[in-house]
Amino acid sequence: MRYLPVFALLVFLVACGVNPNPANPDLTPIAKPNTTQTYDMLSWMTMSPTLSSGHHMAGTANPLYTTMTSSRMYWTKTQAGYPWDVQLFDKNFIYLWVTELDWKNPRSFKVFHSPTLGKFNLPLVPRWAKGGYPGSSIKISDSSYEIHSDCNTFVKKNLGHVINEVWGPYKESLGGQLPNNLETLVISYRYTCDPNYSNCFNKEEYHVAKPYGLVKWQHQSLGSDGTYNPPDNVTYFNHVVSGQVSPVTACF
């Protein structure tokens, strides 16, 4: 699966508001819109330890192996141990950090890095997030990142303004070995937004569920009418398969 959790210091937790480009997932809510329930997002985004010790997810594209350290979460995409998506986490947030550049070269990658906030400039979700439609929301004005052709050779880029939201819970039937009406949360990641956090040209959705972690990912682009076009890339992770790998990294 070649999904790009494409790269987003001022970070603001904001109250829910009306956005001219509706970003809600195309799903039916199952809870009251004013729900105040909070969710441990690390446990929703990662396969449970009892499963991940000997299993991984597979589906319509590449496999997905979950590995954890005390401060990093790896989604490894092949049996070779790379490429990967690497998220950082602490008691406050889970942060997008590293994704691949060349699937065949672990010394090439894209990494969020800000002159002011270092590697913590793109919080994806609060560590403990509020549910809702939407629930927790984060606005990011500094989306600085680096494109590395080698460990120490890189160019600097940015994604414009970014807004990340948690939506749900929902009930989804995603096929494969997953149960019907699986309870999910949807992380909406919108980037290349204008300075008002509107007209975000790109939107990605991470659909996560216990005890599996990531069960669906999709990308949409903003249409000329100001609404999001149907997904142009969708991947399902709906099979639990035996086997685990250790991430292979060369530069971090």
Question: Would you name each region that the model predicts?
Answer:
Residues 2-9:
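Sec-dependent signal peptide recognition
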Residues 12-15:
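C-terminal motif of bacterial Sec signal peptides marking the signal peptidase cleavage site
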Residues 17-20:
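Bacterial signal peptide processing site
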Residues 24-252:
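Conserved functional acidic sites
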